[in-house]
């Protein structure tokens, strides 16, 4: 399960390569993977530039230095039939680099490299200093005091947490030493918030007042570059070029990966949690998870399906169908988590069907209301589960669940196939969505207008998923709850002091499943 094992295996597979393929800027090279399923490209790159790769047909890709030492994972487990990927990243220094690639035998690969002058955005939020500890430091901002401050922070960990009142804490996110900007990805404001520099020091900060039970993942992005000729959306995504785990945070989430760009940092204020990562990832299971490759005639594609079966006998067969299954299972260990909960008697025995979303392009087509997708689930996948796995579950004991677009999809699938899916566990559902030329909150309107169906609901949304006015996922979910209650549906809900992230959804999965199986 640990990613570094994959990295080591990849590196070892290249030890027999005497030479890498040379890659030059602005020139596409292409070829096919042979029986080794791996290859490398070499190039000389300059610092103070950011790189852009366009790749297709490559499943895994790492940036390494000349001797093969890993620097950054750029792609992981991309489907070989997926769309072209565009990747941006900064170069640590002027040097010779390798791109180490992995793919399937016979698959055609394409790769193009471009680099651009690196100019970081000039963005200082200029916000008021409200942290008492930083205010005290600002009164005597000497080099020795700044050095002592960072030494203390390294020992204590970040973010800086200070008292505020009986129900809230003041939390200050910190960064040391950026040139022109630092952004917070996953902020309590639900946006990419810029930090402020403390005078002329190397201290960047941003403070928030948050509830005492706050749970959230975040990254920090120093010196985000200006993207040439970019749209507003493209420039916004530039934060991913440098976004990384907080170097002073002591709690990697879900676990520490092979490089700082590929995991989050955790803020979990004092509050009892069931989803304790990364401990869950190393737990031995009593139950069993089997992996299958499933072809859909309706969707004309293939995907991974994983089925978890508990060790305990299900006197009443129960099933949780979970979208974005690979992420939930591989990165967050939901099968191990539920195995633990079942063993401890906190959940009844329940099977889990993890449905992979293949890639982001197909996810954005399949999960927003799509008639073919609910047909695939009801008429192909559940039939396969019954015929091939011998598991038949009544609709009233079948929960369909997902997060973001997956939350939207769960409510849509149940709306159309209540004969198969009787319960909805929606987390941060994207109920703002509407088909082209339709009003926002389209699915909410469908529930408002249609006859009542035999369904039960559990809706979760984060308090940090709001926007000014009436927008935002939090408000959309509140609107759906109100409509469902007016129509007479059984509805339970949860509003966590959290954002749009998997660590909060891990907790919500337990709470929601417990609520929907507590008959």
Protein language model features and the residues they cover:
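N-terminal signal peptide c-region/cleavage motif recognized by signal peptidases
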Residues: 13-16
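Extracellular Ig-like/FN3 beta-sandwich strand-entry sites
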Residues: 48, 94-96, 213-217
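Short beta-strand segments within Ig-like beta-sandwich modules, predominantly Fibronectin type-III
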Residues: 75-82, 194-200
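Edge beta-strands of jelly-roll/beta-sandwich modules across compartments, strongly enriched
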Residues: 103-115
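Exposed aromatic-hydrophobic patches
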Residues: 41-42, 84-90, 204-209
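Non-catalytic extracellular/lumenal accessory regions of secreted precursors
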Residues: 18-38
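Non-catalytic cap/lid and distal C-terminal segments of serine-dependent acyl enzymes
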Residues: 126-191, 199-210, 214-519
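Acidic, Ser/Thr/Pro-rich low-complexity intrinsically disordered segments
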Residues: 33-72, 82, 92-93, 104
